[in-house]
Amino acid sequence: MQIILLEKVANLGNLGDIVKVKDGYARNFLIPNRKARRATKDAIAEFEVRRAELEKVAAEKLAAAQAVGEKLNGQTFEITQKSGVDGRLFGSVTNGDVAELLKKAGYEIEKAQVRMPEGPLKMIGEHGVQVALHTDVVVDVTVNVIGDHA
């Protein structure tokens, strides 16, 4: 299906690009989340009329993400979990737990924005975690997992 992107989409294209994607990806994700529209002649003409407005909105989102990124980058957050004597956790710290921790600290972060390269944290200690605030703004934070010996 040919679509026109209404915002930058990672691994796909930038605002205004006309790309071909699988029908299911367009119908189930891109179009419902208002990231794209079908690339009909009418839609392309309407997009060209609204292009400046959409670019302004995209620039505002990027500026807001960069402002939050400057505050968040390099910070350390602590979370306490039950652990054994050997330092392994009973359970794990997931991206949902990290997102909840950041929300309590006053940041508007969703679970999907937290990237954990090594997967869920299963040991006590400091671990690096990435937070994708925007497709162009990814910051690194440190999560210090403190063991609560059972």
Curated annotation (Swiss-Prot):
Protein's UniProt keywords contain Signal: no
Record GO terms (molecular function): rRNA binding; structural constituent of ribosome
One GO CC term, this protein: ribosome
Domain of life: Bacteria
Pfam families (UniProt xref): Ribosomal_L9_C, Ribosomal_L9_N
Record GO biological process: translation
Record InterPro entries: Ribosomal_bL9 (IPR000244), Ribosomal_bL9/RNase_H1_N (IPR009027), Ribosomal_bL9_bac/chp (IPR020594), Ribosomal_bL9_C (IPR020069), Ribosomal_bL9_C_sf (IPR036791), Ribosomal_bL9_N (IPR020070), Ribosomal_bL9_N_sf (IPR036935)
Keyword Signal applies: no
Alphabetical keyword list: Ribonucleoprotein, Ribosomal protein, RNA-binding, rRNA-binding
Gene3D superfamilies listed in its UniProt record: Ribosomal protein L9, C-terminal domain, Ribosomal protein L9, N-terminal domain
Protein family membership: Belongs to the bacterial ribosomal protein bL9 family.
Function: Binds to the 23S rRNA.
Name the record gives this protein: Large ribosomal subunit protein bL9
Lineage of source species: Bacteria, Pseudomonadati, Pseudomonadota, Betaproteobacteria, Burkholderiales
Gene: rplI
